[in-house]
Amino acid sequence: MSGRQDASHAGRARARMVERLRAQGIQDEGALAAMMQVPRHLFVEEGLAYSAYDDTALPIGFQQTISQPYVVARMIELLRSGGRQLGRVLEIGAGCGYQAAVLSTLATEVYAVERIRPLLDKARANLRPLRLPNVRLKHADGTLGLPEAAPFESIIVAAAAGGVPNALKEQLAPGGRLIIPVGGGEQRLLLIERQGNVFRESGYEAVRFVPLLAGTE
């Protein structure tokens, strides 16, 4: 198959993925357009490329996964609900770089933190061909956020915590939103909105993420 045919096939698969997301209830057209724009197959292992546009999480090494497309779209939708713009975004758990690429089409800046150095290197290699000038990758402990770049209008956490790290709440700008999966065996999405020094929490659907761990590797 030629490169052009391969790209055409991937484009059709991506369009089917987006239509499936719409059928599953995703209504944020901006999020859907971002998902359509970013080639997910570039972020998965070559042997799993045939599953790149399935609605499933896939292993990316180091006991980590690339989130299923529905969850990526849903978390972005919740951050943007009410016509809100993402602004400056902090992503905790960069993984293979896919979600940072999607966020880059909707945000002014994306700071993506990853605690596992070889995985961060993989994300950097995956993102390089896309030439995204507003994405910055950082090897750091995600539970501590990224204080040197704070505050952030949006924070998105791609790992499940037992509770919301105070550091992340402190780095949220007034009027900002934080989306994070919370729980152990049973997890759910939690949306936190900052109003001055008050943090309002809203719970959403059940999800399954790898755990949020402290430290770096």
From Swiss-Prot:
One Pfam family name from the record?
Answer: PCMT
Q: Which residues form the active site?
A: 67
Tell me a GO cellular component.
Answer: cytoplasm
Residue ranges of the TM segments = none
InterPro entries to which the protein is assigned, alphabetical: PCMT, SAM-dependent_MTases_sf
This enzyme catalyses: [protein]-L-isoaspartate + S-adenosyl-L-methionine = [protein]-L-isoaspartate alpha-methyl ester + S-adenosyl-L-homocysteine
Task: Name the EC number(s).
Answer: 2.1.1.77
- List locations, semicolon-separated: Cytoplasm
List this protein's GO terms for biological process: methylation; protein modification process; protein repair
Question: What PROSITE patterns does the database record attribute to this sequence?
Answer: PCMT
Using the UniProt record, name the top-level EC class of this enzyme in a single word. Answer: transferase
Q: Which UniProt keywords apply?
A: Cytoplasm, Methyltransferase, S-adenosyl-L-methionine, Transferase
GO molecular function terms attached to this record:
protein-L-isoaspartate (D-aspartate) O-methyltransferase activity
Q: Which family does it belong to?
A: Belongs to the methyltransferase superfamily. L-isoaspartyl/D-aspartyl protein methyltransferase family.
Q: What does this protein do?
A: Catalyzes the methyl esterification of L-isoaspartyl residues in peptides and proteins that result from spontaneous decomposition of normal L-aspartyl and L-asparaginyl residues. It plays a role in the repair and/or degradation of damaged proteins.
The family database entries (NCBIfam families) matched by this protein are listed as:
pimt, PRK00312.1
Q: Which PANTHER family does the UniProt entry name for this protein?
A: PROTEIN-L-ISOASPARTATE O-METHYLTRANSFERASE, PROTEIN-L-ISOASPARTATE(D-ASPARTATE) O-METHYLTRANSFERASE
Q: Which HAMAP family match?
A: PIMT
Protein name, please? Protein-L-isoaspartate O-methyltransferase
Q: What is the scientific name of the source organism?
A: Azoarcus sp. (strain BH72)
